[in-house]
Structure formats: C-alpha cells, structure tokens
Amino acid sequence: MNSRTHKLENVLLVAMLFLASVGASAQGMTNTAFKSGEYLSYNLYFNWKFVWIKAGNASFSTTMTRYKGQNAYKSSLTAKTNARADKFYVIRDILTAYCTGNLVPLFYTKNTHEGNRRNLDEVTYQFSGGKCHMKLRRRKTDGVNHYKNVVRNNSFDMLSIFLRARSWNPSGWRNGYKVGFNIVDGKNCNPAYIQYGGKTNVDGDNNRKYRCLKLSYYENEGKGYKRIATFYVTDDQNHIPILIDLNLKFGSAKAKIVNIRGNRYPIRA
C-alpha cells in the first residue's frame, strides 16, 4: 500500500486487525466469530471544507463455497463512491479472498479503480517447511504486470486477516497495547501494528449505539510507522467494525455501519 489517500475499503477491514496475534502464523485456528451468510454494509463520508458529505457505500459478505476441490470461505468486499464524491475522488473497488475452513489464506484478488488509477492485485499463498510463500502480482493502469515472490510468516491480505483475526480475544489488553503483523497486497508486504485505546460508545447509521473498542492502525511503508486510521469495533464475540475515522490529503473520511445481518451471535455491545 502506497498512500493514505486511497483504499477506503481497506480501512473497513483493518478494523479487525487488532485481534491478530503477534505470533500468528499459517497454522489453522478455530473460527469462533462468524458464520457463512454474514453481511455488513456501511455509509462512507468525506469531510470537505469542514462539511461532512455522504460519499458512497461499502459492503462485506462471507459465504462457504469450494476452492480447488476443498471447502473454503469466500469473502467479498465492494466499495463505491457516489456521483457527488466522484468529483473529488473516485472509488470502484471489488476484493475477493478464499481461506480454508480453519482460516488459512489461499488466494486474494483486488480490482481497484481509485482516482485515475486502475490496478489488479493478486496474492497466492503456499505453505511449506513451516514458512509462508506468497506470489504477488500487480497489473497497473498501463497494463504492465509486476511480479514478486515473498517468504514471510505472519502475513495476511486484508480480507483473510479480517476473517482469521475475529476469533482472537483482546479482553486482557490495556491502553497502549500493541499487536504486530504483516499486510500483503499485489506489490508489497509491509509491517503494521494496532494500538489499543480503551472502550467507548459509538453511534451507527442505524439508530443504534454500540459499546466499542477503540484502536489505531499504523503501517510502515518504508519511511517509519504512520497512523492510518482510528476505528471502533463491537466489544462482543462478533468483533464487528462500527465506525472508522481516516485522515486523507483532501480532508477526513469515515465509514459508519448501516446494516448487520447473518451475524453468528446477537449483538451484545
């Protein structure tokens, strides 16, 4: 990832990264947070000259399917700005990922139209000798493909970490606690961490208030760690992101929950 000025869809997903373990690897784990059929939707907002405007929407869904002959979770994320926001910054993104029933990543693809850029990212995972081998591919706006092979444990794309990390329990965390991991896309595998900031109540766009965990996401793109976003996730077994605040070059942005359905547990936050 190269800039904080794009990938709003990623911000929806990093809201779950706080649950990842420092020592996480490709070893499978039991899913305790979601079930097939879960669907989440959000309103996107931009702050333009101190005025918040409705900028578009995003949605995330998870289903059980088949991938190369085995049962797998398929997760899909779409994000789209509306006509008004398109005047400032266009987003038309579709992301898809597959992971095993015990949450080991298999394949990831991201088709993005952000501003004037059109990229296609792919990540293929293979595990051998206790190591995670990743084949990265990015096709840029000019149509040229760029390839890279990376071997690095504790690495996940945004969708696979969203699914995997929701089953971790942060109940023992204290203010300032940090969790480290690596984030991979079609070009880079960057170190990142989440810093815990306590609990607070947050309003959704569905006339409901939620008790949430406050978290800040930092990523190192080669020039030191920078804070990308602050976000709030339900303080219950579902660990669903409710609100995400993001600073962009042209102003601020946020995503607020609109609809939650197919959740594994009743919302108790």
Please report, for each region that a protein language model flagged, where it lies by residue.
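Sec/Tat signal peptide C-region and signal peptidase I cleavage site
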Residues: 22-26
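Hydrophobic, well-structured mid-protein blocks that either form specific transmembrane helices
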Residues: 121-162
